[in-house]
Amino acid sequence: MVQSLHEFLEENINYLKENGLYNEIDTIEGANGPEIKINGKSYINLSSNNYLGLATNEDLKSAAKAAIDTHGVGAGAVRTINGTLDLHDELEETLAKFKGTEAAIAYQSGFNCNMAAISAVMNKNDAILSDELNHASIIDGCRLSKAKIIRVNHSDMDDLRAKAKEAVESGQYNKVMYITDGVFSMDGDVAKLPEIVEIAEEFGLLTYVDDAHGSGVMGKGAGTVKHFGLQDKIDFQIGTLSKAIGVVGGYVAGTKELIDWLKAQSRPFLFSTSLAPGDTKAITEAVKKLMDSTELHDKLWNNAQYLKNGLSKLGYDTGESETPITPVIIGDEKTTQEFSKRLKDEGVYVKSIVFPTVPRGTGRVRNMPTAAHTKDMLDEAIAAYEKVGKEMKLI
């Protein structure tokens, strides 16, 4: 007899719970700022991707409200029918200036970007070299393209060179692309873009950088590609509009020719209603803020260094992060989840990250300090880490 849906779900959900892999979802009452409220209790929030605090910025809220008054709450259609508003054109022109490219295209989410852009260019006659720690949306985008997927050891340039050479010299593929995160979200390390570009030029690879955690954070806000001064060397610059930018959506920046192709061939652009007017205007306001000033960027980095130093002094393993992302690596999945719960009891909200998001045995809580945190908040968080760590004999 075949297995019923109930039997399948019950068996597998129980397995997740028994092995410390089941993630309880909390509901936030109010805005997702540096402090949040859950079930009536306030917590210092170290789990959001709201790097610059823009999700609650008054200027962005005013811009969104004004756009709703003039353009309504929805775009009303897909971009290719009559869902392209003047607000979308303004946003894409602003994004292109921000990223130092000829053009840009906005999508409904960062996940959509990778589903859209990869499959619009790569197909079954091509090969994709992909860093083994790339985001799930990259993995799914690669699968959707039906290209040959070749995993590359994480940030291993010797492995990349060898596999690029093998793929190109095999003569089996029309195009070969290398895809990498700009900043890796679980450990906070940065892709070796100068070396990647050198290898790509040697073997004629297309280059694709998903800078979801780099936009607004690296390169004085313009991203990891700008940080290395390689705007004219990377074919695809991908970014989210939901993390440092503080709203929702994603984008691809590149040549006008590339963007024209994506507008003609990328399925999320063709078959999904465009970004809402309020969101679109708020995003444009956020990007202009980053272009006009580095104040929020600088505050983010100062807060990140302060927290990282405090946790390291306590004896925690904070990994090899080169960015504000600050993991505290515990290891065992069940211990990691218990650690997160104990911190929550002390008023610090920092979620556990365990398999399958990270490899087994590398469970961690991932701290995400923002520009909106005060030093008092960070001191309170560090004190909670000291108390819980000693009680659990982790430090």
UniProtKB/Swiss-Prot annotation:
Cofactors, names only: pyridoxal 5'-phosphate
One of the Pfam families matching this protein, by short name: Aminotran_1_2
UniProt-listed CDD domains: KBL_like (cd06454)
Residue list for modification N6-(pyridoxal phosphate)lysine: 243
Sorted UniProt keywords: Pyridoxal phosphate, Transferase
InterPro entries found in the cross-reference section: Aminotrans_II_pyridoxalP_BS, Aminotransferase_I/II_large, AON_synthase_class-II, AONS_Archaea/Firmicutes, PyrdxlP-dep_Trfase, PyrdxlP-dep_Trfase_major, PyrdxlP-dep_Trfase_small
Residues that bind pyridoxal 5'-phosphate: 110-111, 185, 210-213, 240-243
Enzyme Commission identifier(s): 2.3.1.-
Molecular function, one GO term: pyridoxal phosphate binding
Segments traversing the membrane: none
Gene Ontology process terms (BP): biosynthetic process
Keyword ATP-binding found: no
Residues noted as binding substrate in the record, renumbered to the chain: 135, 357
The keyword rRNA processing appears for this protein: no
Recorded family membership: Belongs to the class-II pyridoxal-phosphate-dependent aminotransferase family.
Assembly, per entry: Homodimer.
PANTHER family: CLASS II AMINOTRANSFERASE/8-AMINO-7-OXONONANOATE SYNTHASE (PTHR13693), LD36009P (PTHR13693:SF3)
NCBIfam families: gly_Cac_T_rel, PRK06939.1
Descriptive protein name: Putative pyridoxal phosphate-dependent acyltransferase
